[in-house]
Swiss-Prot record:
GO terms for cellular component: cytosol. It is involved in the activation of genes necessary for anaerobic respiration. Residues 39-48 are annotated as: Essential for the oxygen-regulated activity. This is Anaerobic regulatory protein. Binds 1 [4Fe-4S] cluster per subunit. GO terms for molecular function: 4 iron, 4 sulfur cluster binding; DNA binding; DNA-binding transcription factor activity; metal ion binding. Its cofactor is [4Fe-4S] cluster. [4Fe-4S] cluster binds at C39, C42, C48, C141.
Length: 273
């Protein structure tokens, strides 16, 4: 009887030790709701903050990141006027950012894909000037800004990567202005589709076949065109043999023609959309 109790105690002790060991080894997984993917294992890390960091620096960054539960479609990540507490790195899904005018009109400012960071525009006033909303079920990594700012002061590579990402966002804004001011409706839509293709390709997805996660209304809002114009232009591109369109699914049949139509070769547009 005594031996049986000792054996039971030993088994319980071993189990507890294993649990404690696992908590120490993968403590971040426990804190983040069981998420097993970390910066070192993330397939899109080359597009995000971890790019160029060594293993020790990655561990320091990884320790401050919170992996949030899935954000459901239409759920808002933050609202205009919210204080800047964190930046958000998109792991999967699509997030749109937008502002709302005094008259209540929505203006979409970007569509963010996996590897993109959301929230940079809040740094100047430490307050979000825009909204961020999921267009589909999405996963994000939440990065506390104060801690990230402190870490970047100690890690030159991290600071350089943040500056590179911010510079890219400024470049995208400039190219968006050029897109809206210099291109006609057909060129705008062609540039939009081509750059989605390019961005999906950079993330390891097909450059020729993909699903539009945004509605035609969203695309029109972003490009300054009506829904009817978007539908008409998609039909025209399909008749020209450049695209095949089935609902939200796009197949690019003639990439060269799409690039030429987008005016990319003339204006060198490489917007991040």
């Amino acid at each position: 009887m005594i031996l049986f109790e000792i054996d039971q105690f030993y088994i319980i002790f071993v189990v507890l030790i294993k649990v404690l060991f696992m908590d120490t080894k993968i403590g971040r997984k426990v804190q983040s709701g069981g998420c097993a993917i970390h910066c070192q294992d993330c397939s899109i890390s080359q597009l995000c903050i971890p790019f160029t960091l060594n293993e020790q620096e990655l561990d320091q960054l990884d320790n401050i990141i919170e992996r949030k539960k899935p954000i459901q479609k239409s759920q808002v990540l933050f609202k205009a006027g919210d204080p800047l507490n964190s930046l958000y790195a998109i792991r999967s899904g699509t997030i749109k950012t937008y502002t709302i005018s005094e008259t209540g009109e929505e203006q979409i400012t970007s569509f963010q894909l996996p590897g993109d960071l959301v929230g940079f525009d809040a740094i100047m006033n430490m307050q979000h000037p825009s909204f961020a909303q999921a267009l589909e079920t999405s996963m994000v990594c939440e990065i506390p800004f104060d801690i990230l700012d402190d870490l970047s002061g100690k890690m030159p590579k991290l600071r350089q990567q943040i500056m590179r990402l911010m510079s890219n966002e400024i470049k995208n804004d400039q190219e968006m202005i050029l897109l809206l001011s210099k291109m006609n409706a057909e060129e705008r839509l062609a540039a939009f589709i081509y750059n989605l293709s390019r961005r999906y390709s950079a993330r390891g997805f097909s450059a020729r076949e993909f699903r539009l996660t945004m509605t035609r209304g969203d695309i029109g809002n972003y490009l300054g065109l009506t829904v009817e114009t978007i539908s008409r232009l998609l039909g025209r591109l399909q008749k020209m043999g450049i695209l095949s369109v089935q609902g939200k699914y796009i197949t690019i049949n003639d990439m060269v023609a799409l690039i030429e139509l987008s005016g990319t070769t003339k204006t060198n547009i490489k917007m991040g959309i």
